[in-house]
Amino acid sequence: ALEAEVKAANGQRAEGSCFPYPIAYNLIPQIGGFNEMGYSSEEMKMQNEGRKMLHDETIRFACTCVRVPIIRSHSEAITLEFENDITPDKARELLAEAPGVVLCDDPNNGQYPMPLLTSDQDLVYVGRVRRDLSADAASFNRSLTLFCCADQVRKGAATNAVQIAELIFGLK
């Protein structure tokens, strides 16, 4: 749909679109239908699956899922509150050592995660690690904000399935 709309924006005829509005050069803050509280089905899925993956039903999530005009990769701006104090530098150190993660965090020199970097890879790119300025005084030293990107087909589905199978069957 995006490729067809880019052609249309360049004066060529576009085929039918699966989106309710033009997606080329646009953002659509809706993925799926809305519930009575105003959350889309994708937002509810993200909240429910996040708790399930982390094995903690008490974790609170707030998210807005937005359809963006790119072909591959998902991106997330994430704010985290930890039980103990953590500095952005310590978080960067831990992320740099994490398997499957690429720390891409030098914003002053234009180095940060972007979908174009992550497409067709099994890696999660993380950057823009910084203090959460919305945190209150009690949690300020325990709160960070970061940005990450990953290919949702490779890392979000296929690679995760292979990695889980490797763990279950002791293949790695």
Model-derived segments and their meaning:
Residues A1-L94:
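Active-site-lining helix/loop region of Rossmann-like oxidoreductase modules
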Residues E57-K172:
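C-terminal active-site/capping subdomain that shapes the small-molecule cofactor and substrate pocket
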